[in-house]
Each structure stands twice: as C-alpha cells, then as structure tokens.
Amino acid sequence: MSILPRRFERIKNVLDCRMKNLTVLVEDVNKPHNLSAILRTCDAAGVFEANFISKTNAVKTFNSTAQGSQKWVKLNNHENTITAISDLKNKGFKLYGTTLNSESVDYRNFDYSQNTCFVLGAEKWGLSNELISMVDQSIF
C-alpha cells in the first residue's frame, strides 16, 4: 500500500508538531472511556505521551472513545504515585495538580514553555492527598 506524497507530508507535519515538553499524569481513572477521552484530548493538543497511575496495573481504553489516539500518544503506566512523580521530576517536569484548595492559583498565571505536567485526579475523588502534597503547584 502506498501513500500519496501530500498525505505523507501532512502526517509528517502533524508528528513534527508533537510537544515532548507537555504531558499529563492521571491518577486512578475508574472508567476506561474517561482515560480514552483524555488520550484523545492529548492527541488533539499535540501531547507526545501521557502517564497513568494504576494500582491494578491494568490500563484499559475504549477504541471507540479514543478514536485511534492510543496509537499516537504513548501511555506510560506507573505502579504507584512515588515512581510516577520521581520519573517525571527526573525528566525535568514541573507538576501542576488540578485541584481546588487554599493554595491553588489560576492556571493562566504561569509560563508553560518549560517541561509541564498537568496532574489529573480520579473522576469521583479528584487528586489524592498524597499526590497533592507532591505537586509543585495546585491550579484551578
């Protein structure tokens, strides 16, 4: 199967725009279709890879919800919060936890040109207290 030069150039241009300095860390998403929707959003925004903390070590996505995004966004599975945070910080990422507390600040007040990781909590409970204590900044 051959690919038309115009289509090849378009695919190449999209892949060249992927942002390796932007990622997300998702903590214990309960429903696979929600993780799939996050991957689809990452793909649309040009995020190169996403990170997931799963205590059960089972990462499931729904193809119908992800619409093929799982092929283009690398999904890194972390066994626990500590290894996830260590890995991202060792790669130079600053972690912004999406939670509303007394220390949260408006997300629009930051320069995101450096390595940035948005940390998202589970649908029912949001971020765990353990993870909130490890992020660099809470944002809303």
Model-derived regions, located:
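Post-transcriptional modification and biogenesis factors for structured RNAs
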Residues: 1-140
